[in-house]
């Protein structure tokens, strides 16, 4: 299980998730429990998909941010984050 924290000036969400999928300058990345630690810049307008414990998938769009992942803890921080 991954603990995902989503933070922006107007939003703060904490979710337990199974996986997280994102597009990065290096290509598409799927993060699952035990993934190698990483720190990724997020391009404006990038979207993320993540899967909750119950199998429901959620989509978010981010502007000007980054993703940090280490020890099954993910933190997504952005100037503007929108649930879509």
Identify the residue ranges that each predicted region occupies.
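Compact, glycine-rich, soluble single-domain proteins
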Residues: 2-84
């Amino acid at each position: 299980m991954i603990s995902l924290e989503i933070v922006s000036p107007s939003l703060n969400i904490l979710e337990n998730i199974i996986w997280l999928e994102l597009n990065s300058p290096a290509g598409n990345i799927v993060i699952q429990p035990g993934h190698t630690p990483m720190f990724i810049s997020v391009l404006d307008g990038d979207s993320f998909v993540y899967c909750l414990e119950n199998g429901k998938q959620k989509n978010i769009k981010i502007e000007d941010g980054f993703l940090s992942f280490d020890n099954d803890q993910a933190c997504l921080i952005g100037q503007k984050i929108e649930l879509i």
